[in-house]
Amino acid sequence: MTLSQWQPSRKSDVPLHRQIEQYMKDKILHGEWAVGTKIPSQRTLADMFQVNRSTVTAAIDELTSQGLLEGRKGGGTKVVNSTWSVLTAEPPLDWSDYVRSGIHRANSSIIQAINQNEPRADIIRLGTGELSPDLVPADTIGRMFQQINPGVLSLGYEQPKGNRQLREAVADHLKGKKIHVSPSAILIVSGALQALQLISIGLLKRDSVILTEKPSYLQSLHVFQSAGMRLRGLPMDDEGVKAGLVSSNRKQYGGQLLYTIPSFHNPTGTVMSEQRRKEIISLSKKEQMPIIEDDAYGDLWFEEKPPQPLKAMDHEGNILYLGAFSKTVSPGLRIGWLAGPEPVIERLADIKMQTDYGSSGLSQWAAAEWLSQGYYEEHLTWVRRKLKERRDAAVHFLERYAGDIATWRIPAGGFYIWVTFHKNLPVSRFFYELLKRQVLVNPGYIYDGEDRNSIRLSYSYASLGDLETGIKAAAETARRLMMS
């Protein structure tokens, strides 16, 4: 269930619980909340509406007395009636059965709460994995669109693999990373996440086991699990995942492939060492093991470049390489790319045509211009400097407010600091208490189901002032919960 950013007015003469009652009633009577819909918990609603729980309880009690809601012990509160069910003798359609039957798994409640609250203007976003609006080159992109030559712009469907000019520009860009692929071996996708979805349904069988780092961004998604696959997390050290662990888990659990973020790993910020990369490549060659290399953050280095990508050392065609503009330029462009063997690219291009007929032509044109005209490298120089300033500020605030209760490693690039508290925390309580303070964090639990004492701290989005306010609030809340 998605709630709008509506808030009751404290300036109104209408009591807060009556405003909430009317808001919820409108959702039910207009059919937005169908019969069978489970509404959020009273605590969640109180956090969303920024009122006391008793206020929400009063609104729900009134709707229950009107026959619109029904609460069941252990089953939450559901919509049981609507205008149509009152006016007709036939029972209304219960969409909840269909919702539960869908093959794609729902996000966890905490991830849903993150997604619902991120658009709020009053929220400090300490977990957001995107550039601040201040770092997005909106003016430059705007000028590019103003200078469009209609003769070179296509508004029709693109080729199955994507705009030829963009694929050529991506191929040239990858040469700078010592990755040599032809445009025909590149597929343009609507962000790296779509590439993972295509791989999950186009290349792998149900019950396949995907090996990945632990913790991992992949654990916060249900791309592979919804396609009937399982994830197997492998612990890392300071140099990344160990080749020996990959090999032993591949043998023991039948791992089909390895998914890895070797440069500025999400969520830990770890950089896989050059030696470890060579070992992983050697293992891939020896065991004929496919690897998905996600290099979304590889260009966002601060002091020095990370070791060359795995794909640059791949001479057997075992690596599927993902790149995107989502982290370096703008998530709104929805442009990424997948480089791999041509038969794989052709297979996934065919599936992509069946799902969306290609990524936005306008976005592909803009991305091609951005790469071919030199805007990208110019922007990277500036954005690296700004991100480094934010990282340094975040580390300073952590030392000031959390130095006695947590540890962390200073990342050499990317967006994230993996902060680990000295004691376990009640994850849900920690998250929602911070939300009450208008601070949004990403608990480590969503990247590793066993984690109870870490958060992924992002310095890419919040302003410096908000970083300090948010980190101070997180440290105060964690300290209090650890002492209770």
Swiss-Prot record:
<dbReference type="Pfam" id="PF00155">
    <property type="entry name" value="Aminotran_1_2"/>
</dbReference>
<feature type="DNA-binding region" description="H-T-H motif">
    <location>
        <begin position="42"/>
        <end position="61"/>
    </location>
</feature>
<keyword id="KW-0805">Transcription regulation</keyword>
<dbReference type="InterPro" id="IPR015421">
    <property type="entry name" value="PyrdxlP-dep_Trfase_major"/>
</dbReference>
<dbReference type="Pfam" id="PF00392">
    <property type="entry name" value="GntR"/>
</dbReference>
<dbReference type="GO" id="GO:0003700">
    <property type="term" value="F:DNA-binding transcription factor activity"/>
</dbReference>
<keyword id="KW-0032">Aminotransferase</keyword>
<dbReference type="GO" id="GO:1901605">
    <property type="term" value="P:alpha-amino acid metabolic process"/>
</dbReference>
<keyword id="KW-0808">Transferase</keyword>
<dbReference type="GO" id="GO:0008483">
    <property type="term" value="F:transaminase activity"/>
</dbReference>
<comment type="similarity">
    <text>In the C-terminal section; belongs to the class-I pyridoxal-phosphate-dependent aminotransferase family.</text>
</comment>
<feature type="modified residue" description="N6-(pyridoxal phosphate)lysine">
    <location>
        <position position="327"/>
    </location>
</feature>
<dbReference type="GO" id="GO:0003677">
    <property type="term" value="F:DNA binding"/>
</dbReference>
<keyword id="KW-0663">Pyridoxal phosphate</keyword>
<dbReference type="GO" id="GO:0030170">
    <property type="term" value="F:pyridoxal phosphate binding"/>
</dbReference>
<protein>
    <recommendedName>
        <fullName>Uncharacterized HTH-type transcriptional regulator YisV</fullName>
    </recommendedName>
</protein>
<dbReference type="InterPro" id="IPR015422">
    <property type="entry name" value="PyrdxlP-dep_Trfase_small"/>
</dbReference>
<feature type="domain" description="HTH gntR-type">
    <location>
        <begin position="14"/>
        <end position="82"/>
    </location>
</feature>
<dbReference type="InterPro" id="IPR051446">
    <property type="entry name" value="HTH_trans_reg/aminotransferase"/>
</dbReference>
<dbReference type="InterPro" id="IPR036390">
    <property type="entry name" value="WH_DNA-bd_sf"/>
</dbReference>
<dbReference type="GO" id="GO:0009058">
    <property type="term" value="P:biosynthetic process"/>
</dbReference>
<dbReference type="InterPro" id="IPR004839">
    <property type="entry name" value="Aminotransferase_I/II_large"/>
</dbReference>
<dbReference type="InterPro" id="IPR036388">
    <property type="entry name" value="WH-like_DNA-bd_sf"/>
</dbReference>
<keyword id="KW-0804">Transcription</keyword>
<dbReference type="InterPro" id="IPR015424">
    <property type="entry name" value="PyrdxlP-dep_Trfase"/>
</dbReference>
<dbReference type="InterPro" id="IPR000524">
    <property type="entry name" value="Tscrpt_reg_HTH_GntR"/>
</dbReference>
<keyword id="KW-0238">DNA-binding</keyword>
